[in-house]
Amino acid sequence: VLLKNNGDGTFTNVAEETGTTFNSLAWGAVFLDADNDTLLDLYVSGGYDGSIGSFLSAAFYHQQNDETFVIPQNIGFENDTRKSFSNAIGDINNDGKPDIIVCNDTENNFLWENKTTNTNNWLKVKLEGVTTNRDGIGNTIEIFINGRSQYRYTLAGEGYISQNSYHEFFGLGEATEVDYVKVTWTGTNTEDIIYDVNANQSITIKEGNGVLTSDDIQTNTLLSLYPNPSNDGVFKLSVNNNKSNTLKVYDLAGRLIFKIKNLKDK
């Protein structure tokens, strides 16, 4: 069963027409963008070991551009032949590609490391609540790229005996920048919005403060100005090379407040 939200408070079972019928005993399921192409894929754990007829032990469904799914061959799951009860996603090597941990019925759980080799980009977002709970559970994250939104809802348990990473994964495809990231804090009905977020980084957004940490800001900055904030003084920047430079100004919370692209010989 795959229940598609119709947007009016009702759902429709689209498992057969989308190719996600799981002819076995399903225990745990998780959506993930395994190849960061912006389309969510699906992994399902099963209660059989694959030795009984055509009953699947598990299945990975790769989403196509027409909202259908296929089970690809020779991508590493051929030995996924254990009875399992749950699964969860995280990023064991911080490369931006979601990995899968599977809880099997006996010892020796499976850890499936994502070896995708494409050049698609990604963004990871972690929340830190202040008025709401510290882990940011129960809130909505929206990113917007190329006229299209993606959403994640932070949870404290995605399935039976399973918990995903607190980092929410977004596949960006070929996009190198996210137009904006918006967090809606359910408990207070407030929003934090940050604009022009670079791809291929992990950021933490603190309730009411915007970006708390940003790998991109910390590691790719040529200079910092102090005191910050300040309201007096003039800073002059000279660019005398042929490279295309970008000037970005952030406040102490990591929020982008000013940006100029394509600085050359200025």
Regions found by a protein language model. Give the residues of each.
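Acidic/hydrophobic-patterned starts of short beta strands in beta-sheet-rich repeat architectures
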Residues: 36-45, 95-103
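Gly/Ser/Thr/Pro-enriched helix-cap/hinge segments flanking short amphipathic alpha-helices
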Residues: 50-53, 68-220
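Beta-propeller blade termini
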Residues: 4, 26-36, 85-94, 113
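Blade-edge beta-strand/turn elements of extracellular beta-propeller
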Residues: 9-19, 68-77
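Short loop/turn segments that connect beta-strands within beta-propeller blades
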Residues: 6-9, 64-67, 115-117
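Conserved loop/turn at the beginning of each blade in beta-propeller domains
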Residues: 22-23, 80
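A short loop-to-beta-strand structural motif that recurs across blades of beta-propeller domains
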Residues: 1-3, 57-61, 110-112
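C-terminal outer-membrane/trafficking sorting elements
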Residues: 146-150, 176, 216-266
